Amino acid sequence: MKQYLDLLKHITETGVAKGDRTGTGTRSVFGYQMRFNLEEGFPLVTTKKLHLKSIVYELLWFLNGDTNNQYLKEHGVRIWDEWATETGDLGPIYGRQWVAWEKPNGDTINQIEEVIQTLKKNPNSRRMLVSAWNPADLPDESMSPQENVKQGRMALATCHAFFQFYVANGKLSCQLYQRSADTFLGVPFNIASYALLTHMIAQQTDLEVGEFVWTGGDVHLYNNTLEQAELQMSRTPYALPKLKIKRKPPSIFDYEFDDFEIEGYESHPHIKAVVSV
């Protein structure tokens, strides 16, 4: 994926040194956009091998409204382990905000369902957004993730904050705004996850896929991933794979892991890096 390699190059060549919450330090740029035509292939990075199982199971977990790490661990996915409490709780993170955003009266809003219904009834609407950024639930940066959860807050502040859908010529496009972007470890997962979600919602609303647009705010490489980024930039991308969805479930909330197949995924070897907590 040339777009992603161009981003790595942009950060390494123009990024500024900044401190951060984790204490690791970053090289950072502010504001960047990548566009992916989903008709041309599924945007899964090929210059290092990605753990596709983690991407799919995490998305299904979000859609289930689940905020406990146990489901992921049962399926061999460990990407949230560092932030969870001893019982697996992560507080009101993405899944809660997506499908059970709490109103002042205690009722909840299923933002995903509302978007799908709007796509079916009024696809020209400019209000087809989902927000996971809820200031009332953000963690206190002076506390550990686990301490925040025990006080009813998110373990980790929302990074991929909100996304919007757009329909033109019978094609569904999605734009994500990611306020904080760990470009080496996180962004490849986020691109694939939201591209997958766009395919799923397109299927549910009888639309074709259009573009996935990724927009980043503080877009950075942690200092402990700079060498890995250089290695990745030295590799030549392979052709993008294709996504096959084997069946159309009754609703967006009924997909299962085995419903998805990635055809023709060829990649360079995995590049190991340590996540900054």
Swiss-Prot record:
Give the Gene3D superfamilies listed for this entry: Thymidylate synthase/dCMP hydroxymethylase domain
The answer to whether keyword Cytoplasm applies is yes
Listed A to Z, the keywords are: Cytoplasm, Methyltransferase, Nucleotide biosynthesis, Transferase
Where is the catalytic site? C159
Q: What is its EC number?
A: 2.1.1.45
Matches recorded under InterPro entries:
Thymidate_synth/dCMP_Mease, Thymidate_synth/dCMP_Mease_dom, Thymidate_synth/dCMP_Mease_sf, Thymidylate_synthase
Pathway involvement of the protein, from the record: Pyrimidine metabolism; dTTP biosynthesis
List the GO terms this entry assigns under cellular component, sorted alphabetically.
cytosol
Q: Which residues form a coiled coil?
A: none
Gene Ontology MF term list: thymidylate synthase activity
Residues noted as binding dUMP in the record, renumbered to the chain: R21, R126, R127, R179, S180, A181, D182, N190, H220, L221, Y222
Q: Which GO terms describe its biological process?
A: dTMP biosynthetic process; dTTP biosynthetic process; methylation
Residues annotated to bind (6R)-5,10-methylene-5,6,7,8-tetrahydrofolate = H51, D182, S276
* Subcellular location, record wording: Cytoplasm
* Catalyzed reaction equations: dUMP + (6R)-5,10-methylene-5,6,7,8-tetrahydrofolate = 7,8-dihydrofolate + dTMP
Output the HAMAP family linked to this UniProt entry.
Thymidy_synth_bact
* Homology family: Belongs to the thymidylate synthase family. Bacterial-type ThyA subfamily.
PANTHER family recorded for this chain?
A: THYMIDYLATE SYNTHASE (PTHR11548:SF9), THYMIDYLATE SYNTHASE 1 (PTHR11548)
Reported function: Catalyzes the reductive methylation of 2'-deoxyuridine-5'-monophosphate (dUMP) to 2'-deoxythymidine-5'-monophosphate (dTMP) while utilizing 5,10-methylenetetrahydrofolate (mTHF) as the methyl donor and reductant in the reaction, yielding dihydrofolate (DHF) as a by-product. This enzymatic reaction provides an intracellular de novo source of dTMP, an essential precursor for DNA biosynthesis.
Known partners and oligomeric status: Homodimer.
Q: What is this protein called?
A: Thymidylate synthase
Q: Which organism is it from?
A: Hydrogenovibrio crunogenus (strain DSM 25203 / XCL-2) (Thiomicrospira crunogena)
